[in-house]
Amino acid sequence: MTSHAVHAPGTTTGDALDDNRWTLARPGPFGVLLTATAPGTPVTAVPVPYLRDLARRHHLVALRGFTAPADAAALDAYARTWGEVMEWPFGTVFDVRAHQDPEDHVFDTGFMPLHWDGMYVDHVPEFQIFHCVAAPGPAEGGGTLFCDTTRVLADADPETLERWQGLTLRYRNAKVSHYGGLVVSPLIEPHPDAGFPVMRFLEPVPDGEHIINEPTVSIDGLEGEAAAAELAAIREAAYDPRHRHTHAWQQDDVVIADNYTLLHTREPYRRGLPRHLRRVHVLGDPPLPSHIHDHHGTTGAGTQRGTT
């Protein structure tokens, strides 16, 4: 299977842009890091078509040292220059930070399953746009780990790949905050625009871990040890160092992630440390329908198509 990911180190011809206000580097097995060289350069100085192209080819784009959007309204306005933004019951901008008494693991500081965004609502966003308002120290955890599923599939042996192509998984989560329901999804499906294969996977909670509002994960046609072994194999491949990269947040980082291709999770960190991200979802064109089958047990309104 051919991977869409760019495996060679360094930049490609298409990455070049004649502007000396930033440099471009490859911080991990995938993704690019743009670092401002001129103080006060706003993130809006980097053309969105250029960033969109980088995000679609490298799947993860981080901007560091730029003047970031000043507040949630400014982040919303910036995201709208990318396209149609997703509306949630809370609005368009989600404050990703720990709650004192969390009702869901999203608002906690410990283990979080690897997942893709939009799985429990009507549409899967193409991009996540993050702004880091505050971050723990470099050695204090709290990074966001991303898995490039094109690399997982490119490195799978033919027998494993054939087996995985026939798998359908079921995920259920009670809706105690802004998401929940039943999702029935193939493990592998084509990228909606480019056609290369990507994975849809919500990691089961490992033995020994406990999270608030734990999801259930099952595989159609497999039970017991057979299902557990398959889920463990998928998880092991996702966390292979060749397939993952952790973005260690710094204040005012702006990150664009390709949610069609990547999975992601939060690295645990100690409660009380400063970690505050803002996130906006940008829908594809046309928006990609999710694999949600029902919203059983949901509360409140669901997501809506956004506005530009």
Predicted regions and their residues:
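A short aromatic-anchored loop/beta-hairpin motif
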Residues: 67-70
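Short active-site loop/helix that positions an aromatic residue
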Residues: 77
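Beta-solenoid repeat scaffold
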Residues: 81-90
